[in-house]
């Protein structure tokens, strides 16, 4: 699986190289996908400067807004919400920017003390017990 991951990541780097070198940001919505570029890419491909650049130029939407557009404004919702933080986001990325965005939304939020469902990444697609639950 790691050999395939390296091959696919090298293909992505080749395709995105002009944008990476131009400093373009990649904004993702799904923490497991973002963590591939931010964490796994630089651990699997250690000899490519563009891999390091892509890692540094990849953001979750809330990170991008908080870091690159700190004065962004959004309509206030004024309601209660429950927040289930994605386990990849909490363990590999960060969750602070979600809180910043929730505050800007004007919501009364409660972050649930919840665990990992185990379905993100390749875990949910491995043959056996995981696969049947994920599909």
Which residue stretches match the model-derived regions?
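Iron-sulfur cluster-binding electron-transfer modules in prokaryotic oxidoreductases
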Residues: 1-135
């Amino acid at each position: 699986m790691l050999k395939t991951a390296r091959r696919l990541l090298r293909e992505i780097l080749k395709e995105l190289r002009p944008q990476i070198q131009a400093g373009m940001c990649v904004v993702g919505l799904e923490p497991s996908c973002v963590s591939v570029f931010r964490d796994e890419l630089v651990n699997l491909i250690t000899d490519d400067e563009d891999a390091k650049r892509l890692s540094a130029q990849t953001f979750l939407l809330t990170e991008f807004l908080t870091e690159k557009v700190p004065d962004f404004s959004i309509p206030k919702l004024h309601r209660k919400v429950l927040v289930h933080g994605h386990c990849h986001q909490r363990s590999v990325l960060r969750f602070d920017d979600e809180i910043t965005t929730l505050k800007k939304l004007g919501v009364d939020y409660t972050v649930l003390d919840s665990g990992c469902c185990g379905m993100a990444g390749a875990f949910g697609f491995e043959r056996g017990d995981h696969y049947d639950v994920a599909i």
